[in-house]
Amino acid sequence: MDILDLATSVDVGWTLVAAALVFFMQAGFAMVETGFTRAKNAGNIIMKNLMDFSLGTPIFWILGFGIMFGAASPFFGGFDFFADGVVGEGYDWTTLIFQTVFCATAATIVSGSMAERTKFSAYCIYSMVISAVIYPVSGHWIWGGGWLAELGFHDFAGSTAVHMVGGVAALVGAAILGPRIGKYTKDGKARAIPGHSLTLGALGCFILWFCWFGFNGGSTVALSGGGAEVASRVFVTTNMAAAVATVTVMCITWIRYKKPDVSMTLNGSLAGLVAITAGCDVVTPVGSAIIGICAGFAVVFGIEFVDQKLKVDDPVGAVGVHCINGALGTILIGLFAYYNGTEVEPLGVFYGGGFHFLGIQILGVVAVIAWVAITMTIVFNIIKHTIGLRVSEAEEIMGLDKPEHGLSSAYADFMPVVPTVLGTKAGETAAKIKDTAPVAVEKAVPVTKVTTEGSAAADGHKLSKVVIITKQSKFEVLKEALAGIGVSGMTVTNVIGCGVQKGAAEYYRGAEVDVTLLPKLKMEVVVSKVPVETVVEVVKKVLYTGHIGDGKIFVYDVENVIKVRTGAEGFDALQDDE
């Protein structure tokens, strides 16, 4: 093997590894979109992401690749079916698989913005159309030797070619589809509909961040001939923009919402990655940091604008992340471009390059927006007026997992878990309660006393039921504390609910949360021998922290208790007769 063959093998290997990383972005998108939507639609989201790639792969091979990389004209590549006449004529199989995973990325962006109310069949049709025609045509303009490429338009890894295409399609689709039931009040105020798992969303964000090194770094398609230097710079600028955008969004939401918003900050990471994708090879680390800051502002105010002003319901923020930041990142190259490969070529306005290059970038963005917006409007309206784009109201309320896929739940045997106190044995924590000072009356956990007529049992002993609502994490220590005063029988239920609290409003992705139902623990005990006052005092000591959410205690008079096995009633029914 000579040096040339070795270099070719290294370049191909590098590109194939990058293609595998880009493929794994599908898992990241699936996790982000699933986590940011409700559990009753989780299976449907997963299927849509799976079909984006599974339908897109053969469609892009049969039709899309020829349109994108054919040489028929500057506007349209040509109909080279099954990549025939394209692979082998300046392109190879490595390019085919690399562009296939890029095409799937553009397609999958739309599923999140149209989540929870789109027919699965309609979505499959959309996915095939964007993979066959929409993405390949604009891709030909940019990467296939088309008219934008001839003008000098620069989009290294796809801020416009991939992300903005998907983002514009997402905006058009969500607008035509309409908002989810309950998203907006009658006066048009946006309501927050929180996703069911920010943990899944965060996992997806980290997967995407990791895979983006292949998405951007692999776009060098070579390590030889200076490619290694460019790839190294791409890694640095990609990571820098994402990190700075994340911090920027955290700070903005901390100021605007009084707390750093988790879901919006996760979107901030993705926004930084999208924005830097076009110019990661030509900007300096300083330029990438500034782009990250711009992306942070754009995603927060962009998501709020789409949600609250345009009244377009985008459950995962795909429009703000991909459409707005795809366009922004592409245009900002005109300001910050400094390199051309391994050479310094300051084309950016801030480096004295003038406005010509900036104008080309703006022209390219506008042209692609127009192409995607017009064609996707036609596609979605055809689907809407033929097979239908949206599920029925009943199906939407039920959740799409059951009516679309026959899936009762994406989470088998799902139910809330009652955790123990982290890092502490229940007995140890209960022992500490004995040394706790009495709780001041004005700071105590609220106690409600409910009385009824004829509440004494037939034997004259007073019976009382104590109902405790508290955090699930308090279960073990509360159980141990009650056992310590002789209360061993109890009924425990996992519940969800909320209390009426005064204070600062809560926000989710910029929209105020009206009511948040939180997982709680409901513990019920009936006592007679143990004084109610003792039970209440112990419960107060266990639950009190001084913060909202400590819980509540309800005390009821009980008319009678009957033990079914023995027939014992009242006080005797509560005693251990073993």
Residue spans for each PLM region:
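Glycine- and aromatic-enriched membrane alpha-helices
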Residues: M1-G454
